[in-house]
């Protein structure tokens, strides 16, 4: 189970890294608004901003998370 999580996180991290390079070279910026809840006439909106720096940050966070999962698997296996 840990190896599947590790591989999924590494692959998403790699794709985020490539996507950040694409955004940087083409100067893209995606602004996404999602209305989470709508009560009567008011709503709660969640806003996302995706640019090259945020995608690069997410790729490194996912890479570090995958390495933590890999290390924990190795640490648990070595204790027995």
Curated annotation (Swiss-Prot):
Domain of life of the organism encoding this protein: Eukaryota
Q: Which InterPro entries match?
A: Proton_antipo_N
EC numbers for this chain = 7.1.1.2
The record's Pfam families line, in alphabetical order, gives:
Proton_antipo_N (PF00662)
Q: GO CC terms on record? A: mitochondrial inner membrane
Q: Do the record's keywords include Zinc? A: no
Membrane topology type:
Multi-pass membrane protein
Q: Which GO terms describe its molecular function?
A: NADH dehydrogenase (ubiquinone) activity
Spell out where the chain crosses the membrane.
4-24, 44-64
> Disulfide connectivity?
none
Q: Which keywords does this Swiss-Prot/TrEMBL entry list?
A: Electron transport, Membrane, Mitochondrion, Mitochondrion inner membrane, NAD, Respiratory chain, Translocase, Transmembrane, Transmembrane helix, Transport, Ubiquinone
Return the similarity comment: Belongs to the complex I subunit 5 family.
User: Which named protein is this?
Assistant: NADH-ubiquinone oxidoreductase chain 5
Q: Which organism is it from?
A: Ceratitis capitata
